[in-house]
Amino acid sequence: MSGPHPTGLHRLAETIAARKGADPETSWTAKLLAKGPEKCAEKFGEEAVEAIIEAVKGDRAKLISEAADTLYHLLVMLAARDVTLSDVENELDRREGRSGIEEKASRK
């Protein structure tokens, strides 16, 4: 978590983690997670495509809305595979200060 005041993404990630054991009948997040990682990944992909469409169309408000949906579904997909937002942040920290070209080359 980043600092004493968690960001909106951290609060959302914490809520998603808390919903992992919730009743799928009362929680949309629990319902998604109960369907398994593959379904969570599918939903993330659908939302990402919707965000892409709005980016191409140029509708700022709709893009913001779809981006929020995409981030939510990314966090759900990560939670389905027991990957935390902190895990992703650690990877970003590891990459910081390296050029994208250099970083991509190091993965080959």
UniProtKB/Swiss-Prot annotation:
Q: In which pathway does it act?
A: Amino-acid biosynthesis; L-histidine biosynthesis; L-histidine from 5-phospho-alpha-D-ribose 1-diphosphate: step 2/9
Q: Which Gene3D superfamilies match?
A: MazG-like
Q: What is its EC number?
A: 3.6.1.31
UniProt feature, compositional bias: Basic and acidic residues: 91-108
Q: Where in the cell is it found?
A: Cytoplasm
Taken from the UniProt record, the cysteine pairs bridged by disulfide bonds within this chain are: none
User: What residue range is the signal peptide?
Assistant: none
One annotated Gene Ontology cellular component of this protein: cytoplasm
The UniProt catalytic activity note for this protein reads: 1-(5-phospho-beta-D-ribosyl)-ATP + H2O = 1-(5-phospho-beta-D-ribosyl)-5'-AMP + diphosphate + H(+)
Name under which the protein is recorded: Phosphoribosyl-ATP pyrophosphatase
Q: Which organism is it from?
A: Paracoccus denitrificans (strain Pd 1222)
> What gene is it encoded by?
hisE
